[in-house]
């Protein structure tokens, strides 16, 4: 296999002038600076394909320690390549969003209700309750709810799904820090959306070394009302999805979607230098081109933290970052 653990970083791009504001946001979720580095515009162009001076801060949550997964990298550019994915719907080609768990979804929703309310390009989903069993059993005093409660918040700075489990647990899939204001975990899973009717996880299994996660085998979905509300789907809009993990790693998972309906293609807004969530990274055994059959736009060099790294485009059009260990 190539990856040494689950998904390492969620990479967010911002203008350099927004650094302190975004550090404060992530600090509220328990992500604190762990390392800082920089690249010149020339070196950033060579590795990331965007020619602007770059300073990056790697942010760590206490839950990252278990498997070196779920960190945040804040890339602060002198000039952005574009305005990114913003609050576009979840299921568009090229979409990304970050998932994390919480022990208090209501506290998060209360604080998100008016957060950044001065901007138009924002979306806070309703609070969605998704029973684990299908068909769902009746919820009574003697038979409490068992499932997930979820709310998604998208704006130009980022796209995050906050999820609370009820009545069950998945040990190791997100490590919640109950000392934090929002009692949340590190980033537990990442999401990508392939082109319509083009579901294919073979590349991620064969080249990344990922495998289908327990309870996450490939299946069709979209006809359940909670899923429709969470993902802003219309009746009849179905999709295929699979959850992938690094072997023996219970967190840092990758969820791969492909709609059965036509969607806009936003892959151009989903790459380094675009505002907001613009990339994901994995730690790997080798960043050599030989380890990456089938990719395009391969670039290699030292990243802003002085680590051996490469970037490339997967066959589904997604940009990825690998870091050598």
Indicate residue ranges for each PLM-predicted region.
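Vicinal oxygen chelate
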Residues: 1-3, 11, 36-38, 45, ...
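Core segments of cupin and vicinal oxygen chelate
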Residues: 2, 13-68, 192-251
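Eukaryotic phosphotyrosine signaling hubs
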Residues: 7-8, 93-97, 275-277
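Conserved GNAT acetyl-CoA-binding A-motif
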Residues: 8-10, 188-190
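Short consensus segments that form the blades of beta-propeller domains
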Residues: 47-50, 86-90, 142, 179-181, ...
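Extended catalytic-interface subdomain
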Residues: 61-77, 95
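Post-signal peptide N-terminal segment of secreted/secretory-pathway proteins
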Residues: 80-93, 103
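Low-complexity, glycine/alanine/valine/leucine- and proline-rich hydrophobic stretches
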Residues: 260-263, 269-282
């Amino acid at each position: 296999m190539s990856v040494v653990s689950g998904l390492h970083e969620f990479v967010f791009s911002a203008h350099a002038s927004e650094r302190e504001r975004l550090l404060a946001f992530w600090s509220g979720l328990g992500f604190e600076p762990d390392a800082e580095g920089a690249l010149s515009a020339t070196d950033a162009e060579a590795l990331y394909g965007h020619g602007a001076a770059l300073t990056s801060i790697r942010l760590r949550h206490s839950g990252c320690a278990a498997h070196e997964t779920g960190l945040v990298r804040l890339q602060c550019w002198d000039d952005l390549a574009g305005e990114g994915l913003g609050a576009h719907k979840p299921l568009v080609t090229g979409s990304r969003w970050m998932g994390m768990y919480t022990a208090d979804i209501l506290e998060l929703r209360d604080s998100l209700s008016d957060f950044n309310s001065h901007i138009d390009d924002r979306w806070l989903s309703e609070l969605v309750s998704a029973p684990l069993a299908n068909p769902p059993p009746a919820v009574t005093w003697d038979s409490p709810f068992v499932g997930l409660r979820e709310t998604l918040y998208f704006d130009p700075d980022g796209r995050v799904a906050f999820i609370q489990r009820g009545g069950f647990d998945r040990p190791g899939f997100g490590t919640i820090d109950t000392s934090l204001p929002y009692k949340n975990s590190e980033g537990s899973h990442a999401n990508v959306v392939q082109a319509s009717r083009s579901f294919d996880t073979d590349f991620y299994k064969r080249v990344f070394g990922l495998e289908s996660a327990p309870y996450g085998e490939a299946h069709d979905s979209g006809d359940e009302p909670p899923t429709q509300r969470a993902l802003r789907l219309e009746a009849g809009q179905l999709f295929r999805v699979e959850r992938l993990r690094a072997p023996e790693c219970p967190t840092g998972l990758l969820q791969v979607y492909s709609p059965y309906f036509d969607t806009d293609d936003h892959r151009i807004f989903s790459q380094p230098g675009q505002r907001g969530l613009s990339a994901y990274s994995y730690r790997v055994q080798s960043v050599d081109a030989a380890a990456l059959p089938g990719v395009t736009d391969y670039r290699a060099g030292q990243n802003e933290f002085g680590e051996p790294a490469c970037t490339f485009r997967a066959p589904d059009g997604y940009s990825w970052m690998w870091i050598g260990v």
